[in-house]
């Protein structure tokens, strides 16, 4: 037992040696003592170590080309969107490492502003999956929010602060780590105001939500209710700084192509105008030509667009891309279903014609890559029901007829082993 001499019975800290008179508190353990000052020091050391481990270190941060290469393993096509995202993410985390400030060539301090991203494109083309794959690569907290569930403060629905709660939960309530995470807000086109002109009546789920999102997009100290729901007095809040949170805002923006076409078409009048045939105009990716004025006409307010300086567009997937999505990425659907069948000791095979037929069906349904899984489930459901109860199946072959004509997949029976033959003849 740690004691001080001179006949006194004073206890002392086993770590710093201070007596119980020199400190506020002395906590006893089995044969050891620790003072309040040493406890504070231990807490500081732990917090520093946790903060260091949660930071994305610049020397470990992949370069834009490496980020794009990683995305290639999981996402087919969308090269322009991959490049835009790779550069935006690299610059964002480089800015965090610089502590929001850097020095230019003349040695002057320059404040580095945040560049959030707006993603445009049809449904089922990989917008959400691109963002999820990015977060997985960088090992940062990632949260997905639906803009349609949000309303202006004081009305029925979710407050914008609930988006931040999802990020904090994804970081296991480690606020420091959450402050360098990524938030993906989907369906943002659904919060466009209903007309181009500001309305006299309140638009609580449209323009009101855009106004409410402005502060957290730009960077602010937000108060988040720990259990979600509405804020009320006498409630404790989690404080989170959104300055270093990267926001990726996305939507299908149906009808925006027409607004862009009208603007581009007006430029094609008069002498010296660039004349394009109808066939050329049909093949042009209108989302790649989007300007802020088009988004304002669509119903986004100028302040909201100003906080989303980077625009990445994704295009409709053609048949070739859909076939590649089925078989080539690391988590391709064909590989996933093969693994499921493999667990039952059965081999699964798709003919090339079958993959083409599945891609054709997805194009007909207009659901993009998202519809591929639904078609695969429909095609494989009968055999996935039967196979677990049978032990005489070697292989299942899916053909084009299986997809187009609802014919059952071809079942190749398992060859009996020699021992089994002897038993039958005995």
Curated annotation (Swiss-Prot):
It comes from the Bacteria. One of its GO terms (biological process) is proteolysis involved in protein catabolic process. PROSITE patterns: CLPX_ZB. Component of the ClpX-ClpP complex. Forms a hexameric ring that, in the presence of ATP, binds to fourteen ClpP subunits assembled into a disk-like structure with a central cavity, resembling the structure of eukaryotic proteasomes. GO terms for molecular function: ATP binding; ATP hydrolysis activity; ATP-dependent protein folding chaperone; protein dimerization activity; unfolded protein binding; zinc ion binding. HAMAP family: ClpX. ATP binds at residues 122-129. ATP-dependent specificity component of the Clp protease. It directs the protease to specific substrates. Can perform chaperone functions in the absence of ClpP. This is ATP-dependent Clp protease ATP-binding subunit ClpX. Keywords: ATP-binding, Chaperone, Metal-binding, Nucleotide-binding, Zinc. InterPro entries: AAA+_ATPase, ATP-dep_Clp_protease_ClpX, ATPase_AAA_core, Clp_ATPase_C, Clp_protease_ATP-bd_su_ClpX, ClpX_bact, P-loop_NTPase, Znf_CppX_C4. Residues 1-54 form the ClpX-type ZB domain. CDD domains: RecA-like_ClpX. Belongs to the ClpX chaperone family. GO terms for cellular component: HslUV protease complex. The keyword Chaperone applies. Zn(2+) binds at residues 13, 16, 35, 38.
